[in-house]
């Protein structure tokens, strides 16, 4: 729930909050099944959270964020090692009044050693961006994720939450304001990387499986 409300996407606003050690420490003391936790690094308390999760061997990932370079650099130094659904729910290069600023996307590119994942369904990201991620981050630092909902592989005939619609091979908000989730399966991601982004098959399979 520790996400920037401005970048929450289709998350329920009422569940969003800043990290609270009285919540996450008891939880993580009682279980060893959590292997990764995604969080917005600019939130108050996020660095203490990342230090704690790192001490537990849990991957902490940047997500749903407006963080710029200094914030990403500091987050990486603390223990944020990965960017979740790269490009989605995070800004790129942008302008505020007359000045231009790097976004989270450029900041992650500049952070050597930070790994990324992409929703390679050809809808969340176009082939040109998939090529760019592959070129700049490389097969060693990139993985493919479906980010799929429970409706994965459905064709739109299955009744779903009325807030969403299935259209053009993806789940969207009913008002068409945003994508709401993927319907892709892993084979679709590999096929997209090979056929649309012209990535070698062996690298596409590696990014989908390692």
What residue spans do the PLM features occupy?
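Short, flexible active-site loop motifs that bind/organize anionic cofactors or intermediates
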Residues: 14, 36, 62, 176, ...
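Generic structural "secondary-structure junction" signal
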Residues: 4-5, 14, 18, 92-95, ...
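Divalent-metal coordination cores built from histidine and acidic residues
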Residues: 1-32
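A polyampholytic, Gly/Pro-enriched intrinsically disordered region
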Residues: 12-17, 84-88, 163-168
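His/Asp/Glu-enriched, well-ordered alpha-helical/loop segment
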Residues: 100-118, 134-146, 151-210
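Aromatic/hydrophobic pocket-lining residues that form the small-molecule binding cavity
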Residues: 20, 24, 46, 186
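Active-site core of metal-dependent hydrolases
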Residues: 25-154
